[in-house]
Amino acid sequence: MLMVISPAKTLDFETPPTTGRFTQPQYLDHSQELIDQLRELTPAQISELMHLSDKLAGLNAARFGSWNPDFTLDNAKQALLAFKGDVYTGLEAETLSEAQLDYAQGHLRMLSGLYGLLRPLDLMQPYRLEMGTRLANARGKDLYAFWGTRISEWLNEALADQGDDLLLNLASTEYFSAVKRSSLKARIIDTEFKDFKNGQYKIISFYAKKARGMMSRFVIEERINDPEALQAFDVQGYRYNREQSTPDKLVFLRNIAED
């Protein structure tokens, strides 16, 4: 089973990594192509394109300017340990053992607007480039056009390396839209996490993102390769709901949201 998750806007390049092991991103030639284009933008243009404050636009202009694909532990960090959003709060990668990191390296991928597809131990430098950014480029009007079918092809390669054809989608709609379902040689399992609020079950973004991270960790800890085994996920009150689920869409409900 191969899992895909979204990246995060929040990054942590201050905390030392919990492992000294790392790999290099596999598709840096494509990243360099984007960086070359982004370097031509002024901070004001970055602000308008990405809807950022002047301060954040200036920060990311500087990041694009200093980006260097010769990644080391001195100028980069392992992707799974660098991202610090709600998904990664649920995943708690900093507490994974070396053996669990090994398993994650083979079974988890992070979608990325700049890097395309990252393995957990792939080094990355800080950036901000959401997949939904409408950055016109030589391949089309936005990043979906830029990546085209490449991400799907790379996922197919990763699945072939595993000898598997099962893809667990734990990414947001924005990011999984960069995966061309028709190009995947895989059975896709989608997930939904709903909390009870105001008399009904609904997807609450913060909780759903955290739950995707918790599900990722559950798969890593239990080394799950059977989709039916995913139904046992019961972390922090979530329970599989058979009535709302289908074989290819697993729905988990929780009656009391966390404070």
UniProtKB/Swiss-Prot annotation:
InterPro entries assigned to the protein according to its UniProt record, in alphabetical order: YaaA (IPR005583)
GO terms of biological process kind: response to hydroperoxide
GO cellular component: cytosol
Pfam families the record matches: H2O2_YaaD (PF03883)
Record-stated family: Belongs to the UPF0246 family.
Name recorded for this polypeptide: UPF0246 protein Psyr_1064
